[in-house]
Design a protein with these regions (language model features):
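Conserved N-terminal beta1-alpha1 strand-loop-helix module at the mouth
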Residues: 1-97, 101-113
Length: 114
């Protein structure tokens, strides 16, 4: 049986999850751009300490950098912000809205669950 490559999931080979607490010495945009230059193709904005307004602002700041490298942007736990920011997807947690509901309300988002 011949195996075929699923190019739709190629972006998952190197997936970076943010942690602002570990990168306080460098702006997140600079850190992210270096990671994208190194081959990262998916970035999850996972900053639980930010307000919704702050999370949206960071997502909107990082989106052009991510798109420049044809990478994917995921927002942690906030499908509404992912949709507004034009992100590619949302990563849900055990306390999030059920994945089926998120997919029904936001059909254009890739939905991940952990």
């Amino acid at each position: 049986m011949k195996k075929t490559k699923n190019t739709d999931l190629d972006f998952l080979h190197v997936y970076l999850i943010s942690d602002f607490h570990h990168h306080q010495d460098e702006p997140i945009a600079e850190h992210l751009e270096k990671a994208l230059q190194g081959g990262v193709r998916a970035f999850q904005l996972r900053e639980k300490d930010l307000s919704p307004k702050e999370l949206l602002a960071v997502a909107l700041e990082l989106k052009p950098i991510i798109k420049k490298y044809d990478a994917k942007l995921f927002i942690n736990d906030r499908a509404d912000i992912a949709e507004i920011a034009g992100a590619d997807g949302v990563q849900l947690t055990e306390t999030s809205m059920p994945a089926g509901e998120v997919k029904d309300k936001f059909p254009n988002l890739i939905v991940g669950v952990s």
